Amino acid sequence: MAAKYGAKVAIAEEYRVGGTCVIRGCVPKKLMVFASGYAELVDEAQCFGWDIKPGTFDWHAFKTRLNTELDRLEGVYRKLLANSDVDTYDQRATIKDAHTVQLAN
């Protein structure tokens, strides 16, 4: 990273660190697709002799688990940034001029 070569590097993110794919897009979608496959697996398992009773889906429990995984991934990104001498700011920022970034607060 640029910080390792002496550049001043910072990231300002008002919501969560990790980007759209990790926080709002690809990762949540893949976890939802993965979780949705269990109902079909139960049906298939019954065809192979498993005595499994169909259950119900608990959206609250799923969302809790999803958020736990997103928290874990965000922690990985934050640790990588900290270990790379990148300052992080949990707020929105705007570019004021060619040499200045202004934090919202």
Region locations from a protein language model:
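Glycine-rich cofactor phosphate-binding loops and adjacent beta1-alpha1 units
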Residues: 1
